Amino acid sequence: MTEYPGADLQGCLALSLVIPVFNEVQSIDLFIARVDRVFANEPLVTLELVFVNDGSVDETLVLLLEKQRADPRIRIVDLSRNFGKEAALGAGLQAARGQAVVPIDVGLQGPPGVVLQMIAHWRNGA
């Protein structure tokens, strides 16, 4: 028998946020700043930000590459053309390396603080 232990929910959690982007050069800085504020006081969460560039024709990829050089948490999946949000999410889910993976919108329609609430419920057995 082989046993595969799950995440140590009381210890440090490796969390991947999967962020599909299409022509979002105006939203990326705000998104990263908000995520940084939300997770600044969470020592038990290590973040991986998986941005999936879904064939953007603006400077989205250029900005992401610049951000990645300065921030080792950032990973980029660059799709060859616009495949749509579902395909971008699928590519990001495949690339994510965290113990927990959460898709989130770069436009902040779903506030990142909700992710912390979800983690708290998860750690409490929900």
State what each model feature region is.
Residues 1-126:
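Structured catalytic core of nucleotide-sugar glycosyltransferases
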